Amino acid sequence: LQQLGLQVDAFDLSPSNIEEANKLANDQLHFFVHDIREPLPKQEQYNVVFNFFTSFGYFDDPIDNARSFQTFAGGLKSQGTLVMDFLNPTYILANLIPEETVHQGGIDFHIKRWEEKGFLYKSITFEDQGQAYSFQEKVELISKEDFLRYAEAAGLHFMNLVGDYTLAKFDAQTSPRMIFFWGKP
């Protein structure tokens, strides 16, 4: 977006991620540490807010999801647009690969995936130079209906929903993604 001449602000909760991203910062591209559950430092400043690649759904309390939508809405100018990309839980669960080993760079990554209490978990274990590593991720399986409720409660109106990065029509059974477009009045 910045390469298209747009002014871009981006944030992440992780200081180390922002430290790495700041290597790319310039006059039109700024990075900062921020918790999406809190109001943005710049209110009503953005024509468009993007949330891509399932960078949502990591909170245990649904109130935090609602607070995040308030933050999105608060950052938008009037007539602004929120574009949010999230996994389609129906598709993901129907096509879940419970266990696999991926060989990359001379390392075998052992990956396990499972659903538990409304969350999708992924465990990754591997060994490198005699050292064992183990990581676990979890993301809430948020339904289309819940997203629509969060957005409506934040004062956003629904504009469109597509099912993948080619912007194909959304189908609950076959679309891998839910990419929402909401507007701020």
Residue ranges and their predicted role:
Residues 8, 82-83:
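A short hydrophobic/small-residue beta-strand
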Residues 37-49:
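A short acidic, Gly/Pro-enriched loop at the edge of an enzyme's catalytic core
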Residues 47-64:
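A short SAM/SAH-binding and catalytic strip from SAM-dependent methyltransferases
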